[in-house]
Amino acid sequence: YFSMAVILFILFYFNRPFEGEKVAECGCMTDELERELFGHRATFIMDPCDDSNRPVPGLHTNVIRRWGVFPKSLEDLFVKAFSKQSILFPEKRVIDREWMTNIIQLRSMLAKCSFCGEETFIEPDLNNQTCIDCERAISKPMVLKIGTYRIPLFEGQKIYNVHLPIDGDINAVVRVN
């Protein structure tokens, strides 16, 4: 489960989760340092309780730009996945089902801004949201709750089979006749 979290972090943020200031300051990576920095003493670069391994401006530009763009629920899941507890105790790690549920919810929050036409995220429970591109205010939408999913309702929103407790192609759009 841990390697899945690392791969997902790289895909979303274009950076490795433990490569921050500590790795940048390392003159020569030895086997011992690698075990320390990426193993039992690893520190997540966005750990809210430990800023000793923050991304380095000019070096870790992607994660600096992208952290805060994705919804907080995804960031919270990465914080949980790379916490000291998850590193030391495998039973505390985020399992694949939790990742899948979160990413399905994430897809439901992706929308086109009604002002600039660029894609942005609309979080169903937040007030005072802005477009990540043009930074104009987005009205809080009505929300459709299906099981654990909270789907913001906006023009063009799709409900997929995966949102419903039915079998079939999970990417198929639900059609109502």
Give a label for each model feature.
Residues 111-177:
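Intrinsically disordered, low-complexity acidic Ser/Thr-rich regulatory segments
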Residues 4-16, 105, 128-140:
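C-terminal, active-site-flanking charged/polar segments
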Residues 27-30, 96-109, 119-126:
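Amphipathic alpha-helical surface "interface" segments used
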Residues 1-2, 7-75:
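Conserved C-lobe activation region of Hanks-type protein kinase-like domains
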Residues 22-24, 94-95, 115, 130:
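Composition- and surface-driven signal marking solvent-exposed, interaction-prone regions
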Residues 75-112:
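Terminal C-lobe "cap" of eukaryotic-type protein kinase domains
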